[in-house]
C-alpha cells in the first residue's frame, strides 16, 4: 500500500534518532522474540518483592524493555529475578566482574527455582553456557587479532532476556 514504508531492521535505530532530531519521537512497535522457554519461579519462602520492586518489574515488562534505576541495596538483582520469572525464558546476564556475577548466582539460587546446574558462568576462568548464563563485560569485549571471539555467546542460545547489570547512563 502507498502509506507503508518498509525499513530494514538494521536501520531502525538510526531512523529513530533522525526522527527525534527533527522533533518527531518514534514509538518502535517492532516487538521482541520470546526466546527459548525456561520456566523460572520466584520462591516465596519468608520474603516477597517490595512494592517498588514489583512496580519496577511490572513497568519493565509492560514496556517490553527498559532501564531499572534504583539506589545501592534497593534490590535491582531481585527486580531482575522477577523479570526473569515473568519471561520464563533463557537469560543472559552481563556483569562488571566475577564478584558481581557470583552475587547474582547466589541471589538467583536463594530467591528462585533455579538450581546451580542451570546457571553458568562465562568469564576468564570458566566458559559455561547454560539456560541462565552470567558473563562478564570484560570477557565479552576481549578482542584478539581484530576479532571478538566471545561475542558468539549472544548467538549461542535463543536468549529470551538479556540483563545488562551496572549500566551507567
List each language-model region with its residue ranges.
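Conserved helix-turn-beta segment of the N-terminal RecA-like "Helicase ATP-binding" lobe
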Residues: 98-125
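Hydrophobic positions in the central parallel beta-sheet of the AAA+
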Residues: 68, 93, 133-135, 162
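Conserved motor-coupling elements within RecA-like helicase/translocase cores
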Residues: 123-133
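Conserved RecA-like ASCE P-loop NTPase motor core of nucleic-acid helicases/translocases
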Residues: 90-97
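Extended alpha-helical interface modules used as scaffolds for assembling large macromolecular complexes
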Residues: 1-35
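Walker A/P-loop
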Residues: 62-87
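SF2 helicase catalytic motif II
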Residues: 138-169
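Conserved pre-motif I regulatory segment
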Residues: 34-69
Amino acid at each position: 500500500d502507498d502509506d507503508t514504508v518498509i525499513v530494514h531492521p538494521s536501520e531502525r535505530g538510526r531512523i529513530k534518532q533522525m526522527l527525534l532530531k527533527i522533533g518527531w519521537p518514534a514509538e518502535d512497535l517492532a516487538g521482541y522474540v520470546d526466546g527459548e522457554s525456561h520456566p523460572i519461579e520466584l520462591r516465596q519462602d519468608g520474603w516477597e518483592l517490595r512494592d517498588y520492586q514489583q512496580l519496577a518489574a511490572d513497568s519493565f515488562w509492560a514496556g517490553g524493555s527498559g532501564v531499572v534505576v534504583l539506589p545501592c541495596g534497593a534490590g535491582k538483582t531481585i527486580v531482575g529475578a522477577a523479570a526473569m520469572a515473568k519471561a520464563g525464558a533463557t537469560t543472559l546476564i552481563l556483569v562488571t566482574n566475577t564478584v558481581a556475577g557470583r552475587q547474582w548466582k547466589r541471589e538467583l539460587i536463594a530467591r528462585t527455582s533455579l538450581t546451580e546446574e542451570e546457571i553458568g558462568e562465562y568469564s576468564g576462568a570458566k566458559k559455561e553456557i547454560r539456560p541462565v548464563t552470567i558473563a562478564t563485560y570484560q570477557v565479552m569485549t576481549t578482542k584478539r587479532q581484530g576479532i571478538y571471539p566471545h561475542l558468539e555467546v549472544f548467538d549461542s542460545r535463543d536468549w529470551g532476556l538479556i540483563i545488562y547489570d551496572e549500566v551507567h547512563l
